């Protein structure tokens, strides 16, 4: 597969490496909306590529299994595509028994969906919310995990500000790992054409919307694109 690397800080690897060094083969479960056509799905497949590459480099020390979940009403990939060849590998490594025990679970979900009953080490990953406050129950959810990974300093600040607002405390490590990766030997911006398209716009007042319509009506579209276009 293409040599794709995700670049986490060393603190992300510490609990994983500590456990792996004490076992012959470490079983890792990655639970996420891996097969959905969504932003979380794209992020999940980036992480899956890194896990599969790590397994390929360390076949005797790590076993990787996937637990695909839904993401709202977004559609699923059922076959591998040119853009997402990892789809077939995800299907081939999907868990068959719901109660299988694992050493490490990585869960790319909303915090209220995280669980701690599948593994000894449980790592929560989430983008949080695009706001300055979240449900305080999410702070409790964070504290149940071994550690939490977020994609931005904004999200991390949101969690800590929420904890302070409700007289709570985040008691587990929370680290920032951007949702980015590079392909070795390639300039990921080399073929970007968005600048040319923007330069071709000849109107003076313009709005750029980035998102996916996720509902079957304006009322249940969580990105609110329908009303954005109407208004």
Predicted regions and their residues:
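N-terminal subdomain of nucleotide-sugar transferases
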Residues: 2-72
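Extended catalytic core of nucleotide-activated donor transferases of GT-like folds
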Residues: 4-20, 29-31, 73-160
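Nucleotide donor/acceptor-binding cores
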Residues: 25-26, 120, 205
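Short beta-strand segments
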Residues: 29-32, 65-68, 106-109, 178, ...
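Short hydrophobic "strand-cap" motifs at the C-terminus of beta-strands
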Residues: 31-32, 125-126, 151, 177, ...
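Short, flexible/disordered intra-domain loops and linkers
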Residues: 36, 76-83, 214-225
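Conserved catalytic-core segment of nucleotide-activated headgroup transferases in glycan assembly
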Residues: 42-50, 183-231
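Donor nucleotide-sugar binding/catalytic pocket of nucleotide-sugar-dependent glycosyltransferases
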Residues: 146-157, 166-193
């Amino acid at each position: 597969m293409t040599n794709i690397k995700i670049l986490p800080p060393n603190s992300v690897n510490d609990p994983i490496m500590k456990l792996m060094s004490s076992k012959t083969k470490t079983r890792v479960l990655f639970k996420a909306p891996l097969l959905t056509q969504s932003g979380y799905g794209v992020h999940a497949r980036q992480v899956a590529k890194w896990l599969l590459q790590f397994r390929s480099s360390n076949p005797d020390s790590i076993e990787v299994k996937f637990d695909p979940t839904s993401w709202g009403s977004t559609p699923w990939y059922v076959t591998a595509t040119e853009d997402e060849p990892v789809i077939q590998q995800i299907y081939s490594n999907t868990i068959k028994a719901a109660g299988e025990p694992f050493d490490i679970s990585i869960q790319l979900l909303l915090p209220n969906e995280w669980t701690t009953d599948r593994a000894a080490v449980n790592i929560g990953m989430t983008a949080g919310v695009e706001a300055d406050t979240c449900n305080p129950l999410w702070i409790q959810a964070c504290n149940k995990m071994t550690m939490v990974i977020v994609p931005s300093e904004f999200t991390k600040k949101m969690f800590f500000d929420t904890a302070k607002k409700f007289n709570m405390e985040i008691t587990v490590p929370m680290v920032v790992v951007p949702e980015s990766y590079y392909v070795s030997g390639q300039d990921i911006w080399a073929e970007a054409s968005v600048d040319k398209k923007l330069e071709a716009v000849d109107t003076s007042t313009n709005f750029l919307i980035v998102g996916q319509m996720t509902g079957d009506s304006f009322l249940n579209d969580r990105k609110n694109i329908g009303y954005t276009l109407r208004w």
